[in-house]
Amino acid sequence: MEACQYEAQIKTAVKEQKAETIVLTDDGMNLTAFWTRLLCGCGTDGRFEPVYVMENIIPLFDKSFNYEIVERESWFYGEYLQAFYTPEANKIVIRDDVYERALAGVALDVITIAHEVVHCIQSIVMRFLNAMQCVEFKTAICSNDSNEMQQHELQTDRITSLVLSPDSLTEGKTNNEILQQYFINPLIQFVCGLIKTAGKNLLEALNDTNCYNEVKEVERCAV
């Protein structure tokens, strides 16, 4: 069943006109999972509740986000695709029986919804980083090529497993190591990204000014 759901997700993803995503390193996936739990109020040892996060936490960070619960009788996306996230509409769509079972704590359905929640969170992160032009947080942006989307689905599975079972994020690490890996290093990268962006913009502005002055000088000499 999980394999069928996975294949159905790939087929759906490659149809998206805006199926762009962040391609993360292993450290990036760990960082995403750690901060996902932190911002969702789970900390390092709390229980991650994807339905609660979808309904209450994500809207706090992204006002454009929405979700839809569709009755099984009206579900036209195939038998095996039980839920999906569409980045173009910024919406999670879930079949109602899957939603109800997830509320009841059925593990497979909890994982299914958690997977889509992680997709949404990755989309939020991507839009934020694109807006800040902080490219150090990502290794590449991939289009809706089927092989690339397959990699993205595997990446999302990995982050989802870390979000639901976070022991490996902090296991064997001291408090100082956790602070360094998940707080200090990302902050340094973020600040460096901002400085690089500011410097690039300044150089472009100076070049534009020099070009403008050269044109004016040519015009003056011509007169």
Regions found by a protein language model. Give the residues of each.
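Hydrophobic or amphipathic, alpha-helical segments that drive membrane association/targeting
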Residues: M1-G78, C142, S146
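Active-site scaffold of zinc-dependent metalloenzymes
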Residues: V70-A107, V117-I124
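A broadly conserved amphipathic alpha-helix scaffold signal in soluble, globular proteins
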Residues: V118, R158-L162
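Long, well-structured alpha-helical subdomains associated
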Residues: E148-E153, S161-V223
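Juxtamembrane/interface and other helix-to-disorder boundary residues
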Residues: C40, F48, P87, R101, ...
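Post-HEXXH active-site segment of zinc metalloproteases
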Residues: A107, I111, S123-D157
